[in-house]
A protein has these predicted regions:
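Short inter-helical turns and helix N-cap capping residues of alpha-solenoid HEAT/ARM repeat scaffolds
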Residues: 3-4, 44-46, 95-96, 131-132
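Core helices of alpha-solenoid repeat scaffolds
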Residues: 23-35, 77-86, 100, 116-120, ...
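Secondary-structure transition/capping motifs at alpha-helix termini
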Residues: 41-46, 62-67, 74-81
Length: 186
């Protein structure tokens, strides 16, 4: 069955609407929706990919109790955030063409919808464990280009430039510790 771009976008907007208005009911269906949404990231249409990211951002940033977990630092986190990033990296690893052609678009859109710092930190943590060094190197190069050239990451670049405060220094050492380790390894 082949759906038009408009139909796909309309379905994604409806799913987004449902997650906003009745998240407690929608989280009962997340295990079925998650793989379908991940597959939609490979769609040829930018509009479909963009709307898929809007839905995923709603899911992975939800404060709904169904999505919450407590990490080792006793902070509440959304359990789907890391799951999404891991699956995104798997998709990029399996489909290098998607990474090369759409990877920057997907990462930039995520940085608009969510915290760029959280995205980069989580990507770095996961890539540190990546056994395929060729993929890790390609992904790091992609992330570097995005960080250096993307207007969506202007605030993050400014934070990295401003090393005058203790908070900035701690930010660099904590957030990008994993990222720098990966760069050194490669």
């Amino acid at each position: 069955m082949c759906m038009s771009v408009q139909t796909k976008v309309a379905v994604l907007k409806w799913i987004h609407h449902l997650f906003i208005n009745i998240p407690h009911k929608m989280f009962n269906h997340i295990e079925n929706l998650f793989p379908i949404l991940m597959k939609s990231l490979s769609d040829n249409s930018d509009e479909v990919v963009q709307q898929t990211l809007v839905v995923m951002a709603e899911i992975i940033s939800s404060k709904s109790p169904e999505a919450a977990i407590t990490d080792s630092n006793a902070e509440m986190q959304n359990k789907y955030f890391t799951k999404f990033i891991i699956n995104l990296l798997r998709i990029f690893s399996a489909d290098r063409h998607l990474l090369e052609e759409r990877g920057a678009f997907i990462i930039r859109e995520l940085c608009i919808l969510l915290s760029a710092e959280d995205i980069y930190k989580t990507l770095a943590e996961i890539l540190l464990e990546e056994s395929n060094l060729s993929f890790a190197r390609t992904m790091i190069q992609t992330l570097n280009v995005i960080l250096l050239t993307s207007s969506e990451l202007f605030d993050l670049r400014n934070k990295l430039k401003d090393l005058e405060s203790l908070v900035s220094i701690l930010y660099i050492s904590c957030i990008f510790n994993y990222y720098f380790k990966l760069c050194i390894l490669l």
